Curated annotation (Swiss-Prot):
One of its GO terms (cellular component) is cytoplasm. AMP binds at T31, R36, N57, L58, V59, G85, F86, P87, R88, Q92, R156, R167. This is Adenylate kinase. Pathway: Purine metabolism; AMP biosynthesis via salvage pathway; AMP from ADP: step 1/1. Its EC number is 2.7.4.3. Residues 30-59 are annotated as: NMP.
Amino acid sequence: MRIILLGAPGAGKGTQSHFISKALGIPQISTGDMLRAAVKEETPLGRKAKEVMDSGNLVSDDIILDIIKERLKEDDCRSGCLFDGFPRTIAQAEALDREGITINHVIEIRVEDSSIIQRMSGRRVHPASGRTYHLTFNPPQQQGVDDETGEPLIQRVDDTEETVKKRLAIYHEQTSPLIEYYTGRAAEGSLDSPRFTTVEGTGKVEEIRDRILKALGA
Protein backbone atom coordinates (compact mmCIF):
# COMPACT_ATOMS: atom_id res chain seq x y z
CA MET A 1 0.00 0.00 0.00
CA ARG A 2 1.35 3.42 -0.98
CA ILE A 3 0.19 6.15 1.37
CA ILE A 4 0.39 9.94 1.42
CA LEU A 5 -0.08 11.70 4.75
CA LEU A 6 -1.27 15.31 4.55
CA GLY A 7 -1.60 17.86 7.30
CA ALA A 8 -0.38 21.26 8.40
CA PRO A 9 2.97 21.73 10.17
CA GLY A 10 2.39 20.73 13.78
CA ALA A 11 -0.51 18.39 12.96
CA GLY A 12 1.53 15.39 14.09
CA LYS A 13 2.51 13.87 10.73
CA GLY A 14 6.00 12.93 11.89
CA THR A 15 4.78 11.02 14.94
CA GLN A 16 1.99 9.27 13.06
CA SER A 17 4.24 8.42 10.09
CA HIS A 18 6.45 6.42 12.44
CA PHE A 19 3.45 4.48 13.79
CA ILE A 20 2.07 3.73 10.30
CA SER A 21 5.43 2.62 8.95
CA LYS A 22 5.94 0.25 11.87
CA ALA A 23 2.37 -1.11 11.91
CA LEU A 24 2.27 -1.84 8.17
CA GLY A 25 5.91 -2.83 7.74
CA ILE A 26 6.52 -0.29 4.99
CA PRO A 27 9.33 2.27 4.70
CA GLN A 28 8.83 5.96 5.28
CA ILE A 29 10.18 7.70 2.18
CA SER A 30 11.52 11.18 2.81
CA THR A 31 12.38 13.08 -0.36
CA GLY A 32 14.71 15.33 1.64
CA ASP A 33 16.64 12.35 3.03
CA MET A 34 16.82 10.69 -0.39
CA LEU A 35 18.10 13.88 -1.99
CA ARG A 36 20.83 14.30 0.64
CA ALA A 37 21.83 10.63 0.27
CA ALA A 38 22.02 10.90 -3.54
CA VAL A 39 24.23 13.98 -3.28
CA LYS A 40 26.48 12.34 -0.66
CA GLU A 41 26.82 9.13 -2.69
CA GLU A 42 27.47 11.16 -5.85
CA THR A 43 24.98 9.20 -7.93
CA PRO A 44 24.25 10.63 -11.41
CA LEU A 45 21.01 12.14 -10.06
CA GLY A 46 22.84 13.35 -6.95
CA ARG A 47 25.46 15.15 -9.03
CA LYS A 48 22.72 16.75 -11.10
CA ALA A 49 20.87 17.86 -7.96
CA LYS A 50 24.08 19.23 -6.37
CA GLU A 51 24.79 21.29 -9.48
CA VAL A 52 21.33 22.87 -9.21
CA MET A 53 21.62 23.50 -5.46
CA ASP A 54 25.14 24.95 -5.77
CA SER A 55 23.79 27.49 -8.24
CA GLY A 56 21.27 28.59 -5.61
CA ASN A 57 18.22 27.11 -7.33
CA LEU A 58 15.56 24.66 -6.12
CA VAL A 59 15.83 21.06 -7.29
CA SER A 60 13.23 20.46 -10.00
CA ASP A 61 10.26 18.14 -9.60
CA ASP A 62 11.69 16.02 -12.45
CA ILE A 63 14.86 15.26 -10.49
CA ILE A 64 12.87 14.52 -7.31
CA LEU A 65 10.58 12.17 -9.26
CA ASP A 66 13.56 10.33 -10.76
CA ILE A 67 14.98 9.84 -7.26
CA ILE A 68 11.58 8.55 -6.05
CA LYS A 69 11.34 6.10 -8.96
CA GLU A 70 14.80 4.74 -8.14
CA ARG A 71 13.83 4.33 -4.48
CA LEU A 72 10.59 2.50 -5.32
CA LYS A 73 12.59 -0.18 -7.15
CA GLU A 74 14.22 -1.28 -3.90
CA ASP A 75 13.05 -4.49 -2.21
CA ASP A 76 11.65 -2.87 0.94
CA CYS A 77 9.12 -0.92 -1.16
CA ARG A 78 7.50 -4.03 -2.65
CA SER A 79 4.68 -3.95 -0.10
CA GLY A 80 4.29 -0.19 -0.36
CA CYS A 81 5.64 2.95 1.26
CA LEU A 82 4.64 6.09 3.11
CA PHE A 83 5.53 9.36 1.38
CA ASP A 84 7.01 11.94 3.73
CA GLY A 85 7.05 15.55 2.50
CA PHE A 86 5.90 14.76 -1.03
CA PRO A 87 3.86 15.84 -2.88
CA ARG A 88 3.64 19.42 -1.58
CA THR A 89 1.97 20.95 -4.63
CA ILE A 90 -0.65 19.99 -7.21
CA ALA A 91 2.07 20.03 -9.89
CA GLN A 92 3.95 17.34 -7.96
CA ALA A 93 0.77 15.28 -7.45
CA GLU A 94 0.01 15.47 -11.16
CA ALA A 95 3.58 14.42 -11.93
CA LEU A 96 3.15 11.30 -9.76
CA ASP A 97 0.03 10.44 -11.76
CA ARG A 98 1.79 11.04 -15.09
CA GLU A 99 4.62 8.74 -14.06
CA GLY A 100 2.12 6.00 -13.23
CA ILE A 101 3.08 5.96 -9.53
CA THR A 102 -0.19 4.73 -8.03
CA ILE A 103 -1.19 6.03 -4.61
CA ASN A 104 -3.61 3.77 -2.72
CA HIS A 105 -4.66 5.95 0.20
CA VAL A 106 -4.37 9.62 1.13
CA ILE A 107 -4.90 10.49 4.79
CA GLU A 108 -5.43 14.07 5.93
CA ILE A 109 -4.76 14.80 9.60
CA ARG A 110 -7.01 17.77 10.27
CA VAL A 111 -6.27 20.17 13.12
CA GLU A 112 -7.57 23.73 13.48
CA ASP A 113 -4.95 26.47 13.07
CA SER A 114 -5.68 27.81 16.56
CA SER A 115 -4.86 24.40 18.07
CA ILE A 116 -1.63 24.14 16.08
CA ILE A 117 -0.55 27.63 17.16
CA GLN A 118 -1.23 26.67 20.78
CA ARG A 119 0.62 23.36 20.37
CA MET A 120 3.73 24.82 18.77
CA SER A 121 4.06 28.24 20.39
CA GLY A 122 3.75 26.67 23.84
CA ARG A 123 6.79 24.41 23.35
CA ARG A 124 9.89 25.05 25.45
CA VAL A 125 13.16 23.15 25.09
CA HIS A 126 16.20 22.43 27.25
CA PRO A 127 18.94 22.90 24.62
CA ALA A 128 21.60 20.63 26.17
CA SER A 129 19.39 17.54 26.63
CA GLY A 130 16.63 18.13 24.08
CA ARG A 131 14.00 17.67 26.80
CA THR A 132 10.77 19.27 25.63
CA TYR A 133 8.03 20.87 27.71
CA HIS A 134 4.76 22.61 26.95
CA LEU A 135 3.40 25.59 28.87
CA THR A 136 -0.11 24.09 28.91
CA PHE A 137 0.14 20.33 28.34
CA ASN A 138 3.48 19.43 29.97
CA PRO A 139 4.78 22.39 32.01
CA PRO A 140 8.09 22.27 33.91
CA GLN A 141 7.87 22.03 37.71
CA GLN A 142 9.32 25.53 37.98
CA GLN A 143 8.39 28.06 35.31
CA GLY A 144 11.07 28.61 32.67
CA VAL A 145 13.64 26.06 33.87
CA ASP A 146 14.47 22.40 33.21
CA ASP A 147 13.22 19.94 35.84
CA GLU A 148 16.52 18.03 36.10
CA THR A 149 19.19 20.71 35.79
CA GLY A 150 17.41 23.95 36.70
CA GLU A 151 18.88 25.47 33.54
CA PRO A 152 16.82 27.94 31.45
CA LEU A 153 14.41 26.67 28.81
CA ILE A 154 14.23 28.33 25.40
CA GLN A 155 11.61 28.77 22.71
CA ARG A 156 12.97 27.73 19.31
CA VAL A 157 12.60 30.25 16.49
CA ASP A 158 10.46 27.72 14.57
CA ASP A 159 8.01 27.63 17.48
CA THR A 160 7.32 31.35 17.87
CA GLU A 161 3.72 32.32 17.13
CA GLU A 162 4.78 34.57 14.25
CA THR A 163 6.80 31.80 12.58
CA VAL A 164 4.03 29.23 13.07
CA LYS A 165 1.48 31.56 11.49
CA LYS A 166 3.78 32.11 8.49
CA ARG A 167 4.26 28.37 8.03
CA LEU A 168 0.52 27.79 8.23
CA ALA A 169 -0.10 30.51 5.63
CA ILE A 170 2.36 28.83 3.25
CA TYR A 171 0.71 25.46 3.89
CA HIS A 172 -2.77 26.79 3.13
CA GLU A 173 -1.54 28.46 -0.05
CA GLN A 174 0.59 25.63 -1.45
CA THR A 175 -0.39 22.33 0.12
CA SER A 176 -4.05 22.67 1.12
CA PRO A 177 -5.14 22.52 -2.57
CA LEU A 178 -3.83 18.93 -2.57
CA ILE A 179 -6.77 18.00 -0.34
CA GLU A 180 -9.19 19.17 -3.02
CA TYR A 181 -7.10 17.46 -5.72
CA TYR A 182 -7.07 14.07 -4.00
CA THR A 183 -10.71 14.34 -2.95
CA GLY A 184 -11.51 14.76 -6.64
CA ARG A 185 -9.27 11.87 -7.64
CA ALA A 186 -10.94 9.61 -5.06
CA ALA A 187 -14.39 10.59 -6.37
CA GLU A 188 -13.46 9.37 -9.86
CA GLY A 189 -13.71 5.81 -8.60
CA SER A 190 -11.31 4.40 -11.20
CA LEU A 191 -8.96 1.49 -10.52
CA ASP A 192 -6.01 3.80 -9.95
CA SER A 193 -7.94 6.31 -7.82
CA PRO A 194 -6.74 6.61 -4.22
CA ARG A 195 -9.04 6.45 -1.23
CA PHE A 196 -9.19 9.72 0.70
CA THR A 197 -9.87 9.92 4.43
CA THR A 198 -9.86 12.88 6.80
CA VAL A 199 -8.86 11.99 10.36
CA GLU A 200 -9.45 14.27 13.36
CA GLY A 201 -5.99 15.20 14.63
CA THR A 202 -6.83 16.31 18.17
CA GLY A 203 -6.69 14.02 21.17
CA LYS A 204 -4.08 11.63 22.53
CA VAL A 205 -1.36 10.46 20.15
CA GLU A 206 -2.56 6.86 20.51
CA GLU A 207 -6.16 7.82 19.71
CA ILE A 208 -5.09 9.56 16.50
CA ARG A 209 -2.92 6.56 15.61
CA ASP A 210 -5.87 4.21 16.06
CA ARG A 211 -8.11 6.40 13.87
CA ILE A 212 -5.53 6.35 11.08
CA LEU A 213 -4.90 2.60 11.27
CA LYS A 214 -8.66 1.96 11.27
CA ALA A 215 -9.03 4.11 8.14
CA LEU A 216 -6.24 2.09 6.51
CA GLY A 217 -7.89 -1.18 7.52
CA ALA A 218 -4.88 -2.15 9.62
